[in-house]
Amino acid sequence: MKLYILGKILKKDARAIAVVGSRLMTPRGEILTKKFVKEFVKKDYTIVSGLARGIDTVAHQTALREGGRTIAVLGSGLDIIYPFENKVLAEEISKHGALVSPYPNGTKPLPKNFLARNRE
């Protein structure tokens, strides 16, 4: 499988933890996500998530705010950020981590792509 990367994958990113959850985040979910991500960043883990609304977004934002590294695994090409409101966040992630996709540029964020991404 070929991976497309925007940003840098470092050796230290092998020490990573995935943080995923509901797109319809509850206030408690937001609080707990921030708490856990802060602790993982303190322990020098790279945060990996999918750039989706909700828990994924909070995980990436918290990692960046705490000075940690984060990697977003997309269900589209690197040139099509989904959801669109995370475009600025995606730019920040590419500077302080990486955007990764199994799909070439031009690939739209179709439901089947997210399902395949989640299995690989």
Feature locations, PLM:
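Glycine-biased, small-residue-rich flexible motifs in mid-sequence functional cores and linkers
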Residues: 1-120
